[in-house]
Amino acid sequence: MKTRRQNLAFLFLIILSNVTVAQKSIGIFDGSGDVGIGVKPGHAVYIPQTQQYIISGAGYNVWADHDEFQFVWKKMKGDFILYTQAEFVGPWVSIHKKVGWMIRKSLDGNSAHVNAVEHGDGLTSLQFRRSPGAQTEEHKLKITHANVLQLERKGNQYIMRAAKYGEPFTTDTVTGIDLGDEVYVGLFVGSHNSDVIETGVFSNVTMTVPFQDVSDQRTQMTLGSNLEIMEVSSGKREVIYKVPHSIQAPNWSPDGKKLLYNDGKGLMHTFDLATRTPKLLNTGNVKANNNDHVISFDGKMIGLSSSVRELGGSIIYTVPFSGGNPKQITPKGPSYLHGWSPDGQSLVYCGSRNGDYDVYKISVNGGEEIRLTDAKGLDDGPEYSPDGKYIYFNSVRSGSMQIWRMNPDGKNQEQVTNDGFHNWFAHISPDGKSMVFLSFLKEEVAADIHPPYKNVYIRMMPTAGGSAKVLAYVYGGQGSINTPSWSPDSKKIAFISNTVVAPTGAVAGK
């Protein structure tokens, strides 16, 4: 197995072999070049296979009243959220070299700007120049050696979030910086030495245009969607498909060949991972499907949740994985499916009866439902462990939303997580060793709601107990990972992140 150092060394060889290559556009960016006068020429390369940017730049500094650095940029307007994981690579000279995100009013060396930066010595800071030629100011974050950098613009407010991968963000903010509506946005590298070129590698780069109409985020699912897969051991993310509308809650088929998701219009689709193409799934006259759908452990059947107003809302159905006419399972709604039993004989779901949402179980043949929880407040997201010993679920009974588990008959209910987040939708890996779940910030949402279009974490922890680790820093929430999404080898997960996507047709990732 290659070590991280070996991987970075390999990337450095790629850099050296591409120093003379000119690219008109670089990945998602419009252009690149050196900022400043008389700067030693730098260069930038995009590696489609890994979706990484390798940027090399020189320059005296990004500081004082003017800057010198290599910049890979895109023009953007309005509000946006920038995210990357950044690493230095190769031999280096100055501890003050810099990598990070930059937002500039112009490409002039003395332009007003805001940047989120990691230094060679580990200093992590939010830097800004309020007007052309003014002195650069700095907010030093409490964290050092951050390799996860996020920079968000909300009007004239700029929010920096930084973390060591696996940990929650540390945040700082500056307000009153007027860079104009249209700005240059991108990644930068500066060497802090005019005669030396330094190199940074940027992974998992996203530029998110967030939801603008905040009148009711609970029901409006209108943003574009990125279908992503992630390797949980390394954190490597890959956008494999993007569309300008809502798709939600990917499930991974047990044979590893396909994903299953719903769209915002209530239709179901399979996605071939080899060809990276979607296909509409025939679900007969059941065409108001929501994001609570699950594939059976043997891969032969799909459980659906679909709205039927006359029956009280969401109703559970089953249908063959190849499609067909669904069979109604639950007699009344709302009923939101979250899990199959490993033997394929039972379904577990969240149901509202008499004004309270609890966990229920029912035979795949229908019949009488069995109530498994009766605590006051919302119980949701029930899912069997692969060995069938537990049903995991999330409950607000403690005052915050946390992960719980119980025996399949509802006995021995015990709390699993207890931390500073609202935790939803635990999904157990096929090998039974790990679980991933969605974490909302308590300062942003109430305990009993899980809205879309929020800065959220997908976290992982051992099922045997221990600390949770952040796997993915995501703009999403509702619809991102509502139902099981592990690959059958327990090495990857699939999920949805959201952004405005130009309506030029669906684009498959490379």
Give the location of each predicted region.
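Intrinsically disordered/low-complexity terminal segments and short unstructured peptides
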Residues: K2, V19, Q49, Y83, ...
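Extended hydrophobic/aromatic-rich secondary-structure runs
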Residues: T3-R4, Q23-P41, M221, S225, ...
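Extracellular glycan-recognition regions
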Residues: Q23-D216
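Acidic/proline-rich low-complexity IDRs
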Residues: N7-I15, D178, D272, S346, ...
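Compositionally biased, intrinsically disordered low-complexity segments enriched
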Residues: L8-F10, T20, I54, N115, ...
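Sequence signature of WD/YWTD-type beta-propeller architectures
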Residues: F211-K510
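Bacterial Sec-dependent N-terminal signal peptides
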Residues: M1-K24
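Short secondary-structure capping/junction motifs at helix and strand boundaries
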Residues: V19, S94, Y158, G303, ...
